[in-house]
Structures are given as C-alpha cells and as structure tokens.
Amino acid sequence: MDADVIVVGAGLAGLVATAELCDAGRRVIVVDQEPRASLGGQAYWSFGGLFLVGSPEQRRMRIRDSADLAWQDWLGSAGFDRDAGDPAGEDHWARRWAQAYVEFAAGEKRAWLHGLGVRFFPVVGWAERGGHLADGHGNSVPRFHITWGTGPGVLEPFVRRVRAAEKAGHVELRFRHRVDELVVTAGAVTGVRGTVLEASDAARGTASSRTPAGDFELSAPAVVVASGGIGADHELIRAAWPERLGRAPRRMITGVPAHVDGRMLAISETAGARLTNRDRMWHYTEGIANWDPIWPGHGIRILPGPSSLWLDARGRRFGAPNFPGFDTLATLKAILDTGYDYSWFVTTHKIVEKEFALSGSEQNPDLTGRNIRQVLGRAAPGPTGPVRAFLD
C-alpha cells in the first residue's frame, strides 16, 4: 500500500479530511488535477459565510437562536420527502447528515474553529430568510457568520496543518494527478488510477491544461472522494435540471472555476457509489457577469438590500416571497415560469451606495485582507471600490 488513506481533491473538504487524518496518525496521499497554486479549491473564492447556531456573535446582536429552531428551519427548507425513514430512501442519510450538522453547528463547531484561529466579523448576516410561514423555507433568524479573512481565512488553518504534515513526511500532495478510475478489489475501493497532466503555471482560478504526460496508480485501504460538484459544467447541470423548476436557462454564468467539473461523481458511481438527489441544486438568481473575469463565464452574485425593484423580462414586478436574499429557488422558478431566463433589477445610485455588496473573497478585499481601516471605510458615503468598479 502507498498510504493509509488516499484523498481525491485538495479543496476545503479534502484539506479538512487530510488534517484530521494526520492528527490521527495516518499517512495520506492527496491527489488533485490542478497545480499547487489552486490549493484550497473553490473555497478560496467564497465570502467565507459559515452556518452557526447560538453563537456569541448572535447573542451580542440579541438574536435568540437554538438547535431546535435551526432544525425546524432546516426541515422546512429541505422537506425530506423522499423516504427519509427508509435506509434505502434518497433522504434517509440526507436527513441523518443534516441533523448531525445542525447539532455540530449549535455545539462544537465554533469552538473548534476558534481554537484553530478562525475569527468572525461581528455582524451576522441573514441569508435565505424565507418569506413563508414559520414552518416553511428559510432561516428564522440571522445565521450567516462571515469569516474574518473570507474564504482564504476559512482555508488558512487547514492549509497550515496540511503543509506542516507534508513537511513532516506524513502527507504527499500530488498535484496534476487526475483520477480517472477508482480501483475496486473484492467489493471495496482500494486505490485510484489516472493521468498525470503536464506541468502548469496557471494562476489560481484560471483554467489549466488537460494535456496528458503519463499515468499513475496508487493503493490504500481507504479512499476519500472530496472532489467538489458540477457548478462549472453547464451540460451536467442541464442533465440534472429538475422539471419542477421549468426549463433550464439557455444562458448561465458561473460562480466557480473551470476545475469544478463534477468528473468524480460519475467515476465514483461506476465504482459502486450511490448518487442521490442529483436534481436538488442551488443556483443564485442575483448574478451578473464579472466585468474582469478570472475563469470562463465568471459570474458574481449581488448582495442587495430590499429597496430595488425586481422585475421580470416583461417589466412586471415579482410578488412575495421573491425578494433578493429571501428564497432563491422560489425566485428561480418564478423567473423561469415567465418563459424567459433573465430578469431586471431596477435601482438607483443612492440605493447602490447604501445597500449593495458583492459576494466572494476578491470582491471584498477589506474583509479578505483583514484591514480594519478599510472595513470602517464602508461607513463613508459612496459604494465600495469593487461595487464602484462594476458600476463604471
């Protein structure tokens, strides 16, 4: 055996798994198709928002939250209507995982992260607040905790731990190693086979080449697949698109780099993995094309307040709960029900100055760079620098 565990994917999930495995004394090989510059995957580009329940940040804002309320909200949003009580049902393990995660978010999650050095912006955001009755979709209270340092700040402690383990000889990071097959022996996954891609100096987030330079095979008694989803492959998205939302949009923009291609899902299924709930996807409707793109079709999500008018393609105003940040999937269906795949956001410079922000680490350099002076500058008149750049 080449290692105790092989981890496929060097994004946040892969790094967390690897760090914890190393702390448990395991030898780990991490393989990833991208170059070292992309260590951390798509999490690097995120706003760094984390779901926490009953946190000190909430209490300072006099937000009353609990595990019971969070679980009620989760049930109202997820539904879990696909045989959740049957171990063979699609929602059985989904519900079990969700309950464990809510308990984690209301329990040790914040203390664990704080112990690793993660800190939070003192203002808690209210994402997906719903707009229905209390037992319907959405968060009853604000739970969106912004990491001080955004996505890179979430990654930092795990990158540090994995690099230290690599230096100590407990981890091998093999970049430009693309897995094409999971090796199955006597019904168990015992390794990976794939292609070594040519060296690439592609910058983080930009597309790297897929030119082969060789083959590889590695073996281990355990293999963890942490390879990410299908967000950058519009054809895979369309193939899994649910009928309940209507016809998939003809034109889409992309919130993640090109390497988020979903390849390992089909590869894992071929090896015997069970894929469930493929049609339960999450697509933001408040996206606009990035004027300065990093990856193909680069889209950025607007984080607006309530004052702008949101109109369909024919100029008719959307009704409740189709407001920005309230119920993303309901709004997506409302847009597609019009027969068009776009909508209009009518606003003013004054509203933009007071209410608009953009999602993503690169669109919030003050928070990402942990610059208190720049953050305080948000209180000054006018939009933030990134918002102004979009307006210009």
Which residues are covered by each model-predicted region?
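Glycine-rich FAD pyrophosphate-binding loop
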Residues: 23-44
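N-terminal glycine-rich dinucleotide-binding loop that anchors FAD/FMN and/or NAD(P) in oxidoreductases
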Residues: 44-75
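Conserved redox-cofactor binding core of oxidoreductases
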Residues: 92-216, 234-235, 288-289
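Short, well-ordered coil/turn residues at beta-beta hairpins
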Residues: 9, 195, 220, 226-227, ...
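Glycine-rich loop(s) and the adjacent beta-strand/alpha-helix scaffold that form part
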Residues: 199-291
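An anion/pyrophosphate-binding glycine-rich loop and adjacent beta-alpha core
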Residues: 265, 271-392
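Conserved Rossmann-like nucleotide-cofactor binding loop
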Residues: 13, 36, 316
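N-terminal Rossmann-like FAD-binding beta1-loop-alpha1 element of flavoenzymes
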Residues: 5-30
